[in-house]
């Protein structure tokens, strides 16, 4: 009998009941809430006269709608200009107070983006099932946890029952072997993977990322990789547990301690795929061949190395692909065969649940140190992923490096990743962004998003156009 994959093990650990229609009932260990997808769920509980099944399994924080300027944050919820945004943040506070759920409110130093806060607090632990009303919940799979996004109706189901109806996925292994070149990061790995398999490549699969290059990554780098599993079509991304995982979790507020810690570690050490486990699909990449990546189009799969040129639709024989390239070039305002390094930028955004952790800010600051944001850049934002990340960065003096270079140093939140708060692009503007999606209008109506790593974003800010960051780090 073949061994089990990590995904198989996690599924079996949480299986409550297999149903005749092929679906199953699985138990949920951790539920993370934010202000956008939770209001209707809480209202559903009230209408049904229910209470959360396990209050202690839930934590919450506002992130999507919160303003990131210090002036707006000092004014509290009342200072949020947009009426809908203000109402959503206020409603989360009220719902968490009413139902007794732990919430890190807008001006709590522990507040931040849900997928930064969960791991930071130790609320995400190896072997858990973790859900949140946000598609980038796959981030938490970096801890060997089965984590994925859910819809608003499912948020209510989890609150009420601590269970979820789901169908088991297929297994995909993405194996990245070798050593990454200097200046090439976890973000470049995952963009290269998406460029290789496409945004539908992982459909119906849970992706396990493995290989020496993945093992060499820090936990924060692994979170970046798992975060963008959904852009590769997979709801779930996973990395096996190792000593780095255990060291990261130890001593965090929600982590077990004393005897329970030893018991937990003994369990966690088995959260790896068996040597003889079988995967439905295997994809292999050579880390040494990966270069700094830049997305050029309106889908994360439209990505190239920084030294390449955007495609020419005339050279594409497939009429569907040709049409897709033509539409993307038109929206992005680019020419066929235009060099990536010839793309003029208007704004730079360093932040989001993909790249706003302390390691990301250190990488960007290393590039920004002693340099100035180019005069052609209208705005360069640095938005830490949480108040604790911001606090740590300020202790290290990273804020001063950014401010002296001409960047704006902001308060934590989702910020310019999506146009749900005051940080957004104007129509026609090009932005080098460390976020995860470059769809039409994602950062603002008519805005043009280019996905890059934090180091590449900082390099673009000081150069005014894309440049291979390795030229600045040499």
Curated annotation (Swiss-Prot):
Pfam families: Aconitase. CDD domains: IPMI. SUPFAM superfamilies: Aconitase iron-sulfur domain. Its cofactor is [4Fe-4S] cluster. Keywords: 4Fe-4S, Amino-acid biosynthesis, Branched-chain amino acid biosynthesis, Iron, Iron-sulfur, Leucine biosynthesis, Lyase, Metal-binding. It catalyses: (2R,3S)-3-isopropylmalate = (2S)-2-isopropylmalate. One of its GO terms (biological process) is L-leucine biosynthetic process. InterPro entries: 3-IsopropMal_deHydase_lsu (IPR004430), Acnase/IPM_dHydase_lsu_aba_1/3 (IPR015931), Acoase/IPM_deHydtase_lsu_aba (IPR001030), Aconitase_4Fe-4S_BS (IPR018136), Aconitase_4Fe-4S_dom (IPR036008), IPM_dehydratase_rel_enz (IPR050067), IPMI_cat (IPR033941). Binds 1 [4Fe-4S] cluster per subunit. It comes from the Bacteria. Pathway: Amino-acid biosynthesis; L-leucine biosynthesis; L-leucine from 3-methyl-2-oxobutanoate: step 2/4. GO terms for molecular function: 3-isopropylmalate dehydratase activity; 4 iron, 4 sulfur cluster binding; metal ion binding. Heterodimer of LeuC and LeuD. NCBIfam families: leuC, PRK05478.1, PRK12466.1. Catalyzes the isomerization between 2-isopropylmalate and 3-isopropylmalate, via the formation of 2-isopropylmaleate. Belongs to the aconitase/IPM isomerase family. LeuC type 1 subfamily. HAMAP family: LeuC_type1 (MF_01026). This is 3-isopropylmalate dehydratase large subunit. It comes from Pseudomonas aeruginosa (strain ATCC 15692 / DSM 22644 / CIP 104116 / JCM 14847 / LMG 12228 / 1C / PRS 101 / PAO1).
């Amino acid at each position: 009998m073949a061994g089990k994959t990590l995904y198989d093990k996690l599924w079996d650990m949480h299986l409550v009941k297999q149903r005749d229609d092929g679906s199953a009932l699985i138990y949920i260990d951790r539920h993370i809430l934010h202000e956008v997808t939770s209001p209707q769920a809480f209202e559903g509980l009230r209408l049904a006269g229910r209470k959360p099944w396990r209050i202690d399994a839930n934590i919450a924080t506002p992130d999507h709608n919160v303003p990131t300027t210090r002036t707006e944050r000092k004014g509290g919820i009342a200072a949020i200009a947009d009426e809908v945004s203000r109402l959503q943040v206020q409603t989360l506070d009220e719902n968490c107070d009413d139902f007794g759920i732990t919430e890190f409110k807008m001006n709590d130093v522990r507040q931040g983006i849900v997928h930064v806060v969960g791991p930071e607090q130790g609320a995400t632990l190896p072997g858990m099932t973790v859900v949140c009303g946000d598609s980038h919940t796959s981030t938490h799979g970096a801890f060997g946890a089965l984590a994925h996004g859910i819809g608003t109706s499912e948020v209510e189901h989890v609150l009420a029952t601590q269970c979820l109806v789901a169908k088991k996925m297929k297994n995909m292994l993405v194996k990245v072997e070798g050593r990454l070149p200097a200046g090439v990061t976890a973000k470049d790995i995952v963009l290269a993977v998406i460029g290789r398999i496409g945004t539908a490549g992982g459909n119906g699969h849970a992706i396990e990322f493995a290989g020496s290059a993945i093992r060499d990554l820090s936990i924060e780098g692994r979170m970046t990789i798992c975060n963008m599993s959904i852009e590769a079509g997979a709801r779930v991304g996973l990395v096996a547990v190792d000593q780095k995982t255990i060291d990261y979790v130890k001593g965090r507020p929600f982590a077990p301690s004393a005897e329970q810690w030893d018991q937990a570690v003994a369990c966690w050490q088995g959260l790896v795929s068996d040597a003889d486990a079988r995967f439905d699909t295997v994809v292999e990449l050579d880390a040494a061949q990966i270069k700094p990546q830049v997305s050029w189009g309106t889908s994360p799969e439209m990505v190239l190395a920084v030294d390449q040129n955007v495609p020419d639709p005339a050279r594409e024989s497939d009429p569907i692909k040709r049409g897709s390239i033509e539409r993307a070039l038109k929206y992005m305002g680019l020419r066929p065969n235009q060099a990536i390094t010839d793309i003029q930028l208007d704004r730079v955004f360093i932040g989001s649940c993909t790249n706003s952790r302390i390691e990301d800010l250190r990488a960007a600051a290393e590039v920004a140190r002693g340099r100035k944001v180019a005069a052609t850049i209208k705005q360069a934002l640095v938005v830490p992923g949480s108040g604790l990340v911001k606090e740590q960065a300020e202790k290290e003096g990273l804020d001063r490096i950014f401010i002296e270079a001409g960047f704006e140093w902001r308060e934590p939140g989702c910020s310019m990743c999506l146009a749900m708060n005051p940080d957004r692009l104007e129509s026609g503007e090009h932005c080098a962004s460390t976020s995860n999606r470059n769809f039409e209008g994602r950062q603002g109506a008519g805005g043009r998003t280019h996905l890059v790593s934090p180091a590449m974003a900082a390099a673009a800010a000081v150069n005014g156009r894309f440049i291979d960051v390795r030229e600045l780090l040499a």
